[in-house]
């Protein structure tokens, strides 16, 4: 079934859908059915693509994700905008779909070095309900490509829920390929607090330099959201702690209370299976904002059985599964 847009009588735009095996009825061309699009609205104009306006993004996000598979109703504006800051969003190259002055769709894009290449990250793509299945998501993506190429961006990356098959197919048509599976887990705070203490391990604040010194200890490459440069993107919003054994740095954690986001948990290979990771997780409970009931560990490489088993032993349970998808620009 094809879809598209065409102009009807002055001031009215319609969406058409071609049904190859269906007749349109008397008086209507057989090749297409014309479905009037929001005719009840006055002064309807053809949506235009312009840069996303930061002050309109939150309202548009909440509308676009009001029926999303994961409940977004509790997302706060301050937290959403901080996440965009963490991901180095550039609103000037993030295309927005506007119906008049109203933002009804968007692809919000962050740019940073990741895996040895300047990379664009799709922080969020969303459309208000009346603007879906009309090809706008593809148009937004295509609109962003020239500016990204001018910036020297070599790759585009995104994450998508595995259950969102229509989105996966749409991304594949745009040239994206599945790079890996990502697991998202969640634990009750009470479970973290109840973790057993680890004797002989001193957990205390650490510097960004100390945290970066263990970067090579990572058993898998972090996703864009959890990249190590995040520690520099929002330094005042991240609590970095180190686990020390005999004065030697054995592991680090990085957690953002404002986002309730576990960014990094690393243990030196020489100190694994000694309770270092457990001590760091237990310590994170001291940073949690008041009223926080859950802590999530997001975007763990699906092939990292050891890491997944560790989180499982600490009381974490499956939340959702995602795919990381990439394409060259």
Q: Model-found features: residue ranges?
A:
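Conserved GNAT acetyl-CoA-binding A-motif
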Residues: 148-159, 290-301
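Conserved catalytic-core motifs of GNAT/GCN5-like acyltransferases
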Residues: 159-161, 177-190, 317-328
């Amino acid at each position: 079934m094809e879809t598209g847009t065409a102009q009807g009588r002055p001031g009215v735009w319609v969406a058409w859908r071609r049904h190859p095996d269906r007749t349109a009825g008397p008086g209507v061309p057989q090749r297409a059915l014309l479905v009037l699009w929001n005719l009840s609205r006055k002064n309807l104009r053809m949506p235009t693509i312009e840069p996303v306006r930061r002050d309109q993004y939150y309202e548009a996000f909440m509308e676009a994700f009001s029926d999303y598979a994961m409940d977004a109703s509790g997302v706060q504006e301050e937290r959403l905008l901080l996440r965009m800051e963490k991901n180095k969003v550039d609103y000037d190259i993030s295309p927005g779909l506007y119906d008049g002055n109203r933002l009804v769709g968007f692809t919000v894009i962050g740019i940073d070095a990741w895996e040895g290449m300047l990379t664009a990250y799709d922080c969020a793509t969303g459309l208000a309900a009346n603007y879906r299945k009309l090809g706008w998501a593809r148009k937004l993506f295509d609109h962003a490509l020239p500016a990204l190429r001018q910036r020297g961006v070599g790759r585009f990356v995104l994450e998508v829920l595995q259950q969102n098959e229509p989105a996966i197919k749409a991304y594949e048509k745009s040239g994206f390929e599945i790079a890996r599976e990502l697991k998202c887990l969640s634990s009750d705070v009470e479970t973290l607090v109840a973790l057993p203490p680890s004797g002989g391990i001193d957990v205390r604040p650490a510097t960004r330099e100390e945290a970066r010194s263990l970067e090579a200890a990572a058993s898998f490459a972090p996703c864009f959201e959890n990249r190590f440069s995040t520690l520099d993107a929002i330094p005042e919003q991240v609590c970095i702690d180190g686990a020390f054994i005999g004065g030697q740095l054995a592991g680090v954690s990085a957690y953002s209370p404002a986002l309730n986001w576990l960014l990094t948990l690393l243990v030196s290979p020489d100190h694994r299976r000694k309770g270092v990771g457990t001590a760091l997780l237990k310590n994170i409970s001291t940073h949690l904002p008041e009223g926080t009931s859950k802590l999530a560990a997001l975007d763990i490489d699906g092939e990292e059985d050891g890491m997944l088993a560790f989180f499982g032993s600490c009381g974490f349970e499956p939340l959702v599964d995602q795919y990381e998808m990439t394409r060259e620009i």
